[in-house]
Every structure is written in structure tokens, then in C-alpha cells.
Amino acid sequence: MPTVSVKWQKKVLDGIEIDVSLPPYVFKAQLYDLTGVPPERQKIMVKGGLLKDDGDWAAIGVKDGQKLMMMGTADEIVKAPEKAIVFAEDLPEEALATNLGYSAGLVNLGNTCYMNSTVQCLKSVPELKSALSNYSLAARSNDVDQTSHMLTVATRELFGELDRSVNAVSPSQFWMVLRKKYPQFSQLQNGMHMQQDAEECWTQLLYTLSQSLKAPTSSEGADAVKALFGVNLQSRLHCQESGEESSETESVYSLKCHISHEVNHLHEGLKHGLKGELEKTSPALGRTALYVKESLIDSLPRYLTVQFVRFFWKRESNQKAKILRKVDYPLVLDIFDLCSEDLRKKLEAPRQKLREEEGKKLGLQTSAKSGSKDSDVKMTDAEASANGSGESSTVNPQEGTSSEKETHMTGIYDLVAVLTHKGRSADSGHYVAWVKQESGKWIQYDDDNPSMQREEDITKLSGGGDWHMAYITMYKARFVSM
């Protein structure tokens, strides 16, 4: 094989062997490796003109030690990226969890789906997570017992671990403390822990947190749980026998959707839940009498929880039986007509503002379709959540803005979580959480298996068969700035 040298620009490449049994294109490929000049750009001067890719070396007559000249421009050297590429498998677990857009599932420790689904729903409330993150032994109120303190800390730690992990988290520490605080969750049957009622777990956990998260010295935000979930009811009691009337107020953490053959929709069930009968002592009659109790909502929470009263005690079988009736519920819930007259008056102006903003938004979207410059429509204040309780708050919904407007509730709520039950009895079957993420996507948390769901699938959990059906729903308030 002849050895040649090639002059290119100011460089001379010596000692290049040419395999004359292969076409000249192979020689050009060698030069590409040495110079970076692609073969199609190489112009090599040989006897008879330019060297062709399929030329005949015998006809060209290249000789050992011959000097060849090449012209051509090399490709630009590819620069390393300014920011190194990081592959998903190389990310730390916490960063990977953030990229996924949803947190990890929870290991079922043996009939603990009631607890897992409760935790996943409550963990979706950012203000509750924030209150828990600020909780410490120093912030503990004197009237909070040790087990309540331990359960609050265990809740805080479990929420944090779920946010940091992509793999299923074992809630063993939380479960141990929950059973210590509430021994009923330790019941055994045939040597195994029994299935429990998710609503009872939800209620007991919220009650504990409401006691622990009270600020011992500050009056501002003194009861974080009440500010988030508390509903004040104004009730009128009427004795049918004596005609006596009285009124009372009470604070609850959820509304009840009572289910009967007349109830087909959540709104109807809520109306039934705000009316009822009870027996109490009548001062006029001097004995126990029947009273009719009618309640109206007098203040609104940031998160409205609704329990579908699906379980009742069945004497024949000595267990909690389940009402399977289908009860539809909306993605957007308006409870204006369930409010007291005073509260309605306070809601009128914010609701009018909300209608105007939504009308304006729809108008902008229409213009965008017809080629308007206003193609980017910003989220209205009504669609943004804001801190604050009651009917108004001085906290701005968009932190960092110069706006001095206050945020006001509208009586309109968006569905953000559903806890479902599948089965015929509260003490058996299976509980699952369905939670809306900040991105707007829905995730089903079936113990340790989170999976994406379509929004239309969420409204199909209304009952009527043996499929998952809503047992607890949680709605988030819409605010407007005024």
C-alpha cells in the first residue's frame, strides 16, 4: 500500500496509507477523521483532475511518498452543552418526584386503605401542609396531650416523605401513633387488623390537628384547621307541639349529604342534611318533645368537605350496611342558596365580580379565535386560590403584587379530591383516593399504586353499583379580588 502526505491549509499530514483495493471514498473518510472536512467537501488534486469517490487507483497512478493537495472547509466543532444533560435515572429521588408532578403511594399494612386514602386527600391541601411544617414542640399548646403531639408530628413527617419519594412509602410510624391515639383502629378479627371507616379516620385526624395547630399565643390564625375546613351553621329549632322557637350556632368540619329515594344529586342531599328532627326538653311542656331543626351556612371554609351518608346500622345483620343509590356530584359546586341571609348579602358583590371576570375571559377567548392580539388569557383571580378565611381576607391572592385589594369568597367551589369506597359494607371493601394535582391532572391513589385518570372518570364515581363510589368529596373555594 502506498504511503502519501496530504497538504491541507497550513498543515501537512504525513504517513497516510492508501489501500488501493478500496475505492477513493474510503481514503476521503480517513481524511475526514484527520481534518474534519466531510468527503463531499474535499477537493483532492491528482493526475487528471480531482479525485472522484469511485475513481480507479490504477488509472490515477498514485505513488509511494507522493504529495497530494486537499482543499475544503471542516465542520464546526460541536460544543459541549452549557448545561449538562441530566437523565431521569440520574436524578435524586426528591427531584424525580417533582418532575413526575405527583407524590408517591402508600403501602397497605393490612386493611389500612381507609387510612391511606384519608392521608392522600388531606395531603393535597397546601395550607395544611404549611401549618404542619411550622409545627414544633415549642409551638405545642399546653392543653395538647402527648399522643396528639405525636400524631401531629407523624402526619407532618409522612406528608414530607410522600413529597420527597417516588417509591411507595410505608406509613408504619403514622399507623402506630394513630392506633395509640385512637385504639378503635387496633381492632382485630381472626388475628388481622379489621377494615375501618375512612370517614371516622378523617374526622379523628382533623380533630387532633385542630387541637395541635392552634397557636398558643397568637390570635391571628389561631385555629388553622377551623380556618381551612370549619363551617359555621346557624340553626333554628321549632317545637311542633308547643310552637317554641330557639336558635343556636355550631361549627362543623363537614356537611352531610343525606341519601333517600328522593335524592339524585349532591345539592339535594345537602338540603336534606341541613334539615332534621331531634328530641330535647321543652321548657313550656316540661318534658321531652320533638323539634324540627333547620340550618343555614353562616360562614364558609376554604375547603368544603362533604360526607355522603351511605352507611347505616342494619340490625338484622348487626353491621353497617351501604346505600348504593347513585348520587351525582358536580365538578363545580355553588352553595349560595344554602347560606344564611346575611352571608348571601356579603356574597352578592363578589359573585357579580366573578361573573364579570368570567364573561370577560370568555370574550377574550372568543377574540383570540378570530385573530385578536390578546391570545394569551391570564387566569382570573376567581380561579386562583387565596389564603384567608370567612368571607374576606386581607391576604393578596398573588403574592408579590402591589395590589391592595382584598380577596373575597364567592360561595362557588371546585372539586379537588374524592375518597371512594368499593364494596357492600363500611367494615369491608376497599377505599381509594382520587386527587387533583396543581397541574389540573387527576391521580388515583390506590394504596401504593398511583395512576393518572381523566376528569370525566371522576364524575363516574357517583354510585349505583359495585364500582368505586364517592364517600367523601372535598371542594376548594373560588375567590375574587375587590
From Swiss-Prot:
Protein name: Ubiquitin carboxyl-terminal hydrolase 6
Residues in USP domain copies: 104-478
Organism: Arabidopsis thaliana (Mouse-ear cress)
Active-site residues (renumbered): 113 (nucleophile), 430 (proton acceptor)
Substitution effect: residue 113 to S: Loss of activity
EC number: 3.4.19.12
Any one GO molecular-function label of the UniProt entry: calmodulin binding
Annotated effect of mutating residue 175 to R: Abolishes the calmodulin-binding
Function, in words: Recognizes and hydrolyzes the peptide bond at the C-terminal Gly of ubiquitin. Involved in the processing of poly-ubiquitin precursors as well as that of ubiquitinated proteins.
One GO location term (cellular component): nucleus
